[in-house]
Amino acid sequence: MSEKLKFRLPTAEDAAEYISYRQAFLDAGSSMDGTGPMRRTPDPMEWLAINAQYADPATVPEGKVQSTQFVCERVSDGRIVGMLQVRLALNDYLLHYGGHIGYSVRPDERRKGYASWMLAQGLDYCRSMGLRKVLITCLNTNEAS
C-alpha cells in the first residue's frame, strides 16, 4: 500500500466526512461494521457523543462494553477510508457475533490494503490496553476478510 494513512480518534472536524462515509454504505447496502451506532445516527455530533459515552467506563450503558472508536484517514486528501472499533471486553453478543474488533472500509475504497493496515493498528491498540487475546469474527460470506 503506497498511501499514507492516519489511525486516530474521530473529531467534530470529521462531520462532513462522517456524512459522506455513512451515505456511501447506505447507497451500497453495505454493513457498517466497526462504526458503532452509525447506521441509526445520521447526526455526526450525536455519534461523537455516543462514542464518548462508550469510551468512559463510568458512562457505558448497562449491558454494553467500553469501546474506543477510530477512523482511518487518507493523508493525501483527508478522506475517511475506514473505521475500526475496539471493544475492551466481551458481552455474550460480542463473544458470538462481534468480537473485540469491528471494522469496515468505505465501499469504493476496498481492496487497497486499508483493512489489513487498520487491523494492525487496532491490534497494537489492544496490546497497549492490556488485551492479550483478541477475538475477531467474520461472516463466511466476507471473502475479503
Task: Annotate the PLM regions.
Residues 110, 136-145:
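Conserved beta-strand-loop-alpha-helix junction that forms the acyl-donor binding cleft
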Residues 17, 118, 144:
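Charged catalytic carboxylate motif
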Residues 126-137:
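Conserved GNAT acetyl-CoA-binding A-motif
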